[in-house]
Amino acid sequence: MDKKELRSHIKTLKKQHSKESLLEQSKLILNKLENHKSFIEAKTVMLYSSLPDEVFTHDFLEKWRNEKKIILPTVVGDDIIPVELSKDTEFAIGDFNILEPQDNEYTGDYDLIIVPGVAFDRIGNRIGRGKGYYDRFLCKHLDVNRIGICFDFQLVDEVPTEDNDIKMNEVISLS
């Protein structure tokens, strides 16, 4: 299965799950994440503002925004620009209908980067939506622990890869 076919297959599988089921699964996946040694020890974590077909992170962001330095991606042109989340951060709908923070670029270090994806395999390969935003961003941060989070139906036997694809160090799902 090539990347386009895999994206279509995952989209079909997602339709078999109710919004309520995905929200409940998201809570359980994020509970696994917050009990993970890498998350517990991390002071600065890059997360993401979820789209409807991703592990739902909005409540998780609110829960942790005062406990850790939380960084969120914004999309500017072809690049991810990281922004630190603060108690005063305002949000606006950005490209792809993603709720993005409106603040200055974060230029510090990261302890952990949490990455969404359309599909992952158990050895850390991932495909996103096909624009390469995360791969371009992650290639500048190869020394940082990268954890992909996904629903079980997004975890497949093998993800087709290309030379510029950046692997996750680990993938967290319910299974």
Q: What spans do the regions from the language model cover?
A:
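Conserved phosphate- and dinucleotide-binding cores of soluble alpha/beta proteins
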Residues: 81-175
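N-terminal active-site beta-alpha-beta segment that forms phosphate/nucleotide-binding
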Residues: 1-100, 104-108
